[in-house]
Regions:
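Active-site loops and adjacent core secondary-structure elements that bind or stabilize anionic groups
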Residues: 1-196, 214-232
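Glycine- and Gly-Pro-enriched alpha-helical subdomains that act as flexible
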Residues: 71-112, 242-341
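Internal active-site segments that recognize and position negatively charged phosphoryl groups
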Residues: 202-244
Length: 392
C-alpha cells in the first residue's frame, strides 16, 4: 500500500486528505477500523517514542498520546498494589506482563488527559495488554504485531470500529525529513538522540550520585520530551512519566503545569483518596473526574450537599491544603527533564516542591550558575546534556 485515503485532514473542512509514500510502500497495515489524520500523527510520533524507550532501557514501553503530545509514557516495570488500585486494574484477573504494565502506567499517570488516547506499544501486543485496552476509552493502537487473541479482543472494541495499526518494526525513515507550511517546504535532518551510559555523565552539581533507576527515569524524560510539543518539561518516577507539561511559551509555566500533574498523581495515592467510597455503578471516567475535583481547588463541586450523594456512598472529609502538603512532602526521588535550558532557579524551586532529586537539561543559560546553586541547596543531582529537544 503506497497511499491511504483519509476522511478529512485536521478538521472536517480540510479535504481531500491522505497519507502516502513518494517511493515504496507504507510501512503499516490497518488491521481494523479506520484511522484519521490526527490518529496517524499520534501513532507515528508515539511509535518512535516507544521504540526509542525500548532501545534505551531494554524494557517494553508504551505511550498514551493526545493531540500529538504524550499524556503518559512508561516502561513495563512491576506495579505495586497501590498503583494497581489507582490505575483501576486491581480487579483484573490477568497476567500483568511487562507490556501490560507499561500501558497501565502510561494511561494511569494522567487519566484525565489520556481519555480517548491513541496508544503506541513497543512490542507485540499480548492478550493481557489487549484486555487492559479493552476497558479504556481509546481511539486506536499501533504496535509491531498482535497475538491472535489480542487482535480478536481489539477488533471487538467500539462495536468493531476500533483502529488497529500494525507497523513494520524494521522500517527506517530517510535521514532528511520535510513538511509544507503555507506552500513552503521545510527540510531538516532527523533528530537522532541515542541514550547510552554516558548521556548523563556531565554532572554539574555537588551531589553526583545518579542511581540506575534515576538513569532510566531521566532517559524516559528525555525521550518523552523529544516527541512532546515545545516548550516541554517532564517529571518521571519509577519508570513512568508522572507529569508532562507541553506546548507552553514560558519555561516556568511548563514546570508548574507538569508539577501539578505530578502532584495529582501522588495525591491519588494518599489515604484520603484510597479511602473514597464511590457509589455503585459509577463510570470510570466519572470516577477519574470526581477524584480530580476532590484533590483540587474546586472540591466543593463534589462535596456540596446534594452533590456528594451523586458520587459517594459516604461523604468524605475535605482534603485540606495542610494535609495535601504533608502528603506531597513524602514524595521523593523524582526525575525531571527539560527540552531546553532552565533560565532561572525558580524552575528548580518549583520542582523541589514535587519531590525532584534528579535533573537533566541542556544547560547553556547565562544564569546556569544560579540554577546549579539552587540544585545544590536541595542536594539535587543535575546533568547538563548539551542537547536541546524542541519538537514542532
Amino acid at each position: 500500500m503506497q497511499e491511504y485515503e483519509l476522511k478529512y485532514g485536521c478538521n472536517p473542512n480540510q479535504k481531500p486528505a491522505r497519507i502516502f509514500m513518494k517511493e515504496g510502500e507504507l510501512p503499516i497495515k490497518v488491521l481494523n477500523g479506520r484511522a484519521g489524520y490526527i490518529n496517524f500523527l499520534d501513532a507515528f510520533n508515539g511509535w518512535q517514542l516507544v521504540r526509542e524507550l525500548k532501545k534505551a532501557t531494554g524494557i517494553p514501553a508504551a505511550t498514551s498520546f493526545k493531540h500529538v503530545s504524550p499524556a503518559g509514557a512508561a516502561v513495563g516495570q512491576p506495579l505495586s498494589d497501590v498503583e494497581k488500585k489507582i490505575y483501576w486494574v486491581d480487579d483484573m484477573d490477568i497476567e500483568f506482563t511487562p507490556l501490560a504494565n507499561a500501558y497501565i502506567r502510561a494511561r494511569g499517570a494522567d487519566r484525565m488527559s489520556s481519555f480517548g488516547d491513541f496508544i503506541s506499544l513497543s512490542d507485540v501486543c499480548d492478550k493481557s495488554t489487549a484486555l487492559v485496552i479493552k476497558r479504556e476509552v481509546s481511539d486506536g493502537v499501533i504496535a509491531p504485531g498482535y497475538t491472535d487473541e489480542a487482535l480478536e479482543i481489539l477488533k471487538a472494541k467500539k462495536k468493531g470500529n476500533y483502529c488497529v495499526i500494525e507497523i513494520d518494526p524494521s522500517y527506517e525513515p530517510a535521514p532528511i525529513e520535510r513538511k509544507d507550511v503555507f506552500g513552503i517546504t521545510f527540510e531538516q535532518g532527523r533528530n537522532e538522540l541515542h541514550i547510552d551510559d554516558d548521556f548523563f555523565s556531565n554532572i554539574v552539581t555537588e551531589n553526583k550520585e545518579l542511581t540506575e533507576q534515576a538513569k532510566i527515569d531521566l532517559a524516559i524524560s528525555m525521550i518523552t520530551l523529544k516527541y512532546t510539543q515545545s516548550n516541554s518539561v517532564c517529571y518521571v518516577k519509577g519508570g513512568q512519566a508522572i507529569g508532562i507539561g507541553a506546548g507552553q511559551q514560558s519555561r516556568i509555566h511548563c514546570t508548574r503545569l507538569a508539577g501539578s500533574k505530578a502532584d495529582n498523581w501522588w495525591l491519588r495515592q494518599s489515604p484520603q483518596v484510597l479511602g473514597l467510597q464511590f457509589v455503585d455503578g459509577i463510570r470510570r471516567a466519572d470516577r477519574d473526574n470526581t477524584i480530580d475535583l476532590y484533590i483540587g481547588e474546586d472540591y466543593m463541586d463534589v462535596l456540596a450537599e446534594g452533590e456528594w450523594q451523586k458520587f459517594f456512598k459516604v461523604k468524605p472529609d475535605v482534603f485540606t491544603a495542610e494535609e495535601k502538603r504533608a502528603w506531597l512532602d513524602k514524595n521523593t526521588d523524582v526525575a525531571l527533564g527539560s527540552d531546553a535550558f532552565f533560565p532561572f532557579g525558580d524552575n528548580i524551586e518549583r520542582a523541589h516542591k514535587s519531590g525532584v532529586k534528579y535533573v537533566a537539561q541542556p544547560g547553556g543559560s547565562v544564569r546556569d550558575d544560579h540554577v546549579i546553586e539552587t540544585c545544590n541547596k536541595y542536594g539535587m543531582v543535575m546533568s547538563f546534556t548539551g542537547i536541546r529537544l524542541f519538537h514542532h
